[in-house]
Regions:
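Ligand-binding clefts of soluble mixed alpha/beta catalytic domains
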Residues: 1-348
């Protein structure tokens, strides 16, 4: 722990990113409480470095017990399929306490944390590709919160015309499409580093370049759940926006959202509290913020997705944009509820 703390202190002093390669079974219990104090020192420095220098955790094997908390405090977590695991209590403890038999992969494997928990931001098939992914991510990030993200000269003209963009957003408001196709057409060389690709896929987040300058992208994904906002997507996007704001990375929002996901499950689990995190992140961010309304922009979700009212710097509307207090079906149900109740066939 003392070695790790020394590196963390030096990184903060020099304004350098920290990459941690983690393969740990937890605290060495032979050292008693002293081992816990070592963990505490690491965690404290993770917190002090948050928003000051980029912190990346690479899980190269098991990360159990106290070893999982440091990665959880960092900005990005990489895992390797079939060889890396993260859990607070391992399968043996689960068996003893709950009498449940579960494998390390089922409990805290890469697929679990990439799809279900959202703990893992990137998953690769082997260690070599995992480390390549770390290098790719670092190529988009500044060394600290004082510097700007690396500029990369490009021969891709900013004013190029993409005729196919005219037809990518369907005129039918209920027809799904993949917003990634739009992202690839507008970014430099069509490159886009997507983050947390398999978690809360109804919203897309990632890094790209425009004219050589790094930009964070947040985009509703109509292909999944019609692009509605739920708890997981709200938290996912809010965390990314906070990171971009900390490290001077402008944010482009591509909006096509019919609203927040309705239902008792979402309400009981705290959609109000979690949805507010996205609202707070956008409002608090001081980096340049641009929004393009691609199609739907309804109700509270319209406000949350970087509307001008909460501080959006420039807001543009695609030709297919629809901005309203709610969708047409909901508006009809409220405005004409008496007529509908009296009608012989309300559906007609």
């Amino acid at each position: 722990a003392a070695k790790i703390i020394k590196v963390q202190d030096m990184a903060l002093k020099t304004g350098s990113p920290v990459v941690g390669l983690i393969d740990s079974g937890g605290a060495r219990i032979q050292e008693g409480v002293a081992s816990l104090a070592g963990y505490a020192g690491i965690f404290r420095r993770n917190v002090l470095a948050s928003g000051v220098i980029p912190q990346i955790s690479v899980i190269m094997g098991p990360a159990a017990g106290g070893a999982v908390y440091s990665p959880a405090l960092t900005d990005f977590i990489f895992m390797t399929a079939a060889t890396s695991y993260m859990f607070v209590t391992g399968p043996n403890v689960v068996k003893q306490v709950l009498n449940e038999t579960i494998s390390p992969e089922e409990l805290g494997g890469a697929s679990v944390h990439a799809v279900k928990s959202g703990v893992a931001d990137f998953v690769f098939n082997d260690d070599e590709n995992t480390l390549r992914g770390v290098k790719m991510l670092l190529s988009y990030l500044p060394s600290n919160n004082i510097e700007n993200a690396p500029y990369l000269a490009t021969d891709d003209p900013a004013d190029r015309i993409e005729e196919s963009l005219r037809d990518l957003v369907p005129e039918d408001p209920d027809k799904p499409y993949d917003v990634r196709n739009i992202i690839r057409l507008i970014t430099d060389k069509g490159k886009f580093l997507e983050i947390a690709e398999n978690y809360a896929p109804n919203i897309i987040i990632g890094l790209a370049r425009f004219g050589g300058y790094v930009t964070g992208i947040v985009a509703n994904q109509p292909q999944v759940m019609a692009g509605t906002l739920d708890m997981n997507s709200s938290v996912k996007a809010a965390r990314f926006i906070n990171f971009c704001d900390s490290f001077n990375i402008p944010i482009l929002t591509l909006e096509d959202v019919p609203g927040f996901l309705p239902g008792a499950d979402q309400e009981h689990a705290g959609i109000i509290r979690h949805g507010a995190k996205l609202l707070y992140a956008y409002t608090r961010a001081t980096v340049p913020k641009i929004t393009v309304v691609l199609r739907k922009s309804y109700g509270g979700a319209y406000i949350v997705m970087n509307s001008k009212g909460i501080g959006g710097d420039y807001n543009f509307a695609w030709p297919t944009a629809e901005i309203a207090v709610m969708g047409p079906e909901g508006a009809i149900a409220i405005l004409y509820h008496k007529e509908l109740a009296a009608a012989e066939d309300p559906v007609a």
